[in-house]
Amino acid sequence: MLPNIQRTLAMTARAACVTIVAFFSTPGHAAEVHVLSAAAMQSVFKDIRDEFQRTTGYRLVPHYGTIGAVNEWTMGGEEADLIISSSQSMPSLVYRGKIQAGSQTAICQTSIGVVVAAGIELNLNSVEELRRALLAAKAIVYADPARGGAAGIHVARVIEQLGLTEQLRPKLRLAAGGDITEVTLSLGPTALGITQISEIADKPLAQLAGPLPEELQNYTVFVAGVPADAPQSEGATALLKFLRSPKAIAVIRAKGMEDFGSDGGSE
């Protein structure tokens, strides 16, 4: 009887191993890579998610917010495997021990543009043309600067720089966490929104009227870093590598962002 019991136990053990392997090999149970990211990267992650998951076996789980929110989450100890914030913010996160020194990678750069309903034409080639467009608009939408978004903070400065703060105040609409483009469209064809150009992409009922004039432009460089206590640092490394691949770079460029080159990764 003993040999039979041993054989039975061995078969049971082998079956259990097969079950465990199958469990963790299925897409529903793939290791997850949690990302805290600036919202400007949302359209990029939306388009690369399937390919990243297919080629690496990791499941991408992004969470979006303003740069200020991402920094607050990181400082507060929110668990994540990768943080994507601005180049201005990352050194402080490293200094405070929240991001591993040497893990930072510049991903892309974006600028600020004006969004309007599809079919609306605006000339924004000069500061004066932007001034006229702002004065003519029935509503102007941008991110609430108090929430820490780079675009919202800069737009408020631009309006002040143009000397239009009081004149425009009645028609300013601060979007508290909402999609700037969607809020703009909801206010009708005479409204315009000002936000990161990457956040205007993939909106069929909207169009980019143009970037801010160069004299008033602001560029944000997005940098990724691995948290000091990242649960899935290998997955974070895989995502960083994928973000520098030709496929990811093609998506980044399609969103109106400037990449920082390929590392020759997977095609």
What residues fall within each predicted segment?
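Exported/periplasmic ABC-transporter solute-binding proteins
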Residues: 30-76, 87-88, 92-96, 100, ...
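Intrinsically disordered, low-complexity peptide-like regions
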Residues: 2-3, 69, 79
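N-terminal secretory signal peptides that target proteins for export/translocation
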Residues: 1-11
